[in-house]
Curated annotation (Swiss-Prot):
Family recorded in the similarity comment: Belongs to the serine rich endogenous peptide (SCOOP) phytocytokine family.
Name of the protein in question: Precursor of secreted transmembrane peptide 7
Induction, per UniProt: Induced by salicylic acid (SA), mainly in roots.
GO terms assigned for molecular function: LRR domain binding; receptor serine/threonine kinase binding
GO-annotated cellular components: apoplast; plasma membrane
Length: 80
């Protein structure tokens, strides 16, 4: 009787581990209705970056204003 209970417990734990691994390895696919890629592939979710203009609730440290490179005129504007 005791071995049957332990076998059931091992089977349950193994199935839970497989389920957790499967769910954690999935990639979030964003269903985009307004924008589609040219080749028709779905847009894959990527984590937000800490670049200029990006914000996230867990970022509490403020490093000051964004430093962006100065704007330069395109070559067509410089021609006479």
């Amino acid at each position: 009787m005791g071995s049957k209970t332990s076998t059931n417990m091992v089977a349950l734990l193994l199935s839970l581990l497989i389920l957790i691994f499967t769910l954690s390895s999935q990639v979030k696919v964003v269903e985009a209705t307004s924008r589609k890629l040219a080749n028709g592939r779905p847009i894959v979710w990527t984590p937000a970056s800490r670049s200029c203009g990006a914000s996230h609730a867990s970022w509490k440290k403020n490093n000051g204003p964004c430093k962006r490179p100065p704007r330069t005129a395109p070559a067509s504007y410089n021609s006479p």
